[in-house]
Amino acid sequence: MTHDTRSLYSQLSSIDSLLHQADIQTLVDGYGQTFIVEHLRKLQEEARIIIRQNNQLPQWHDNWAEELKNRIALQRKAAIKPVFNLTGTVLHTNLGRALMAESAIEAVSQVMRSPATLEYSLDGASRGHRDRAIADLLCELTGAEDACIVNNNAAAVLLMLATVAPDKEVVVSRGELVEIGGAFRIPDVMCQAGCRLKEVGTTNRTHLKDYRNAINENTGLLMKVHTSNYSIQGFTAEVEGTQLAALGKEMNLPTAIDLGSGSMTNLAALGLPSEPMPQDYLQQGIDLVTFSGDKLLGGPQAGIILGKKAWIEAIQHHPLKRALRVDKMTLAALDATLRLYQQPEKMIKDIPTLRLLTRTQTEIHDMAQRLLPHFQAYYGDNYHITISSCASQIGSGSLPIESLPSAALTFAAKDGKGSQLDALAAHWRNLEKPIIGRITDGRLWLDLRCLEDENALIQALSL
């Protein structure tokens, strides 16, 4: 160690002397002495490393309190923060999928603040079942005999397969071996559930006879998987739910369909592309139907299993059910969301997913015109800003080939450099409430379909 290095080390303030500084004492009052001392020690160690490696004091040596305050603020920033979703994808998986209805938010808030009847029966002051109230509501809405709720649709499929067809073959069309995000594949789920996949048909055409010919003494389930995140078009054929249900009844085998997204209302009646509903397959005679809670339903993340009472009871008693069950907050949000489906006249207005999906291009274009002057004031010197027609996506693997006419503010760098667009997108991502758009075709696009609070966006630009 050189004389200069020793001199630099000697200039480092002690913990005790730092704690007597007024600004640091203020931080102690706010966060507690243990917390502050721990962070001061980390700063001291970092300072020693800087001296050892660079033979100089850290830049913040003369203002430990300010550096400490900045470090604490950075550390205490929320890991998950609200953003403006202007990507054009309504159910954006990476941005949290469905927004909650206000009644669902209030319901979650209430059960977080107070004990609740999660597994308590007020009728007999005894233990109840956490799924029961929501199961009754689902049965009322869909005509199912019973229902089960778990933490997502992948869990619903896993639990259903593990209960219905352990150590058995599950017959599925080759064209329905779906992979969802994160390389999560139906064949892999079957393997984890202890089932054996029996592929039938071809990628583009599967017939009822393919299912029939695959049945043997090892068959445990006849299954369909709705290809919600891709579409096979052209020379195609698939087995209808009524056909599969009839074959299952004839051969005394259970039948099931994994809907993936699953809509609880007729989207076509709302002017949207059609998506199969669970109640349709139940009416066709399918024994079990699974789907998601946080996609087209517009509720919290959950997996829902509907179907025959005997099978649902068996599913409820499977050991995996306890590992996959949902908490009181999910159940409260799901309950409140489902109750909105009992009021069709309020449903579209009160469920954000349906409200956003049904917005007209004219409405969105009018919003773009109101916002354009504000963006020009901030960014007009460096960017050409225009209003452009565009196509929104539903997202989360729902209706993959369908799109919704929308409108966007688009930005093109006046110097023609793509790096300027990257810089602008990065700037927006670093705002207190980040603005998330997309760069395509040499422009930065802000699709306004999912924007409902114009003033909040304008305010975000000024921060």
UniProtKB/Swiss-Prot annotation:
Question: Does Protein biosynthesis show up as a keyword for this record?
Answer: yes
Protein name per UniProt = L-seryl-tRNA(Sec) selenium transferase
Gene Ontology biological process terms in this record: conversion of seryl-tRNAsec to selenocys-tRNAsec; selenocysteine incorporation
Which NCBIfam families does the UniProt entry name for this protein?
A: selA
What function does the entry list?
Converts seryl-tRNA(Sec) to selenocysteinyl-tRNA(Sec) required for selenoprotein biosynthesis.
| Top-level enzyme category | transferase
What Pfam families does the annotation carry? Se-cys_synth_N (PF12390), SelA (PF03841)
Catalysed reaction, written as an equation:
L-seryl-tRNA(Sec) + selenophosphate + H(+) = L-selenocysteinyl-tRNA(Sec) + phosphate
Give the UniProt keywords, A-Z: Cytoplasm, Protein biosynthesis, Pyridoxal phosphate, Selenium, Transferase
Q: Which subcellular locations apply to this protein?
A: Cytoplasm
Task: Offer an example of a GO molecular function term for this protein.
Answer: L-seryl-tRNA(Sec) selenium transferase activity
Q: Name the family the entry cites.
A: Belongs to the SelA family.
Q: Which InterPro entries match?
A: PyrdxlP-dep_Trfase, PyrdxlP-dep_Trfase_major, SelA-like, SelA_trans, SelA_trans_N_dom
According to the UniProt record, one GO cellular component term is: cytoplasm
Q: Which gene encodes it?
A: selA
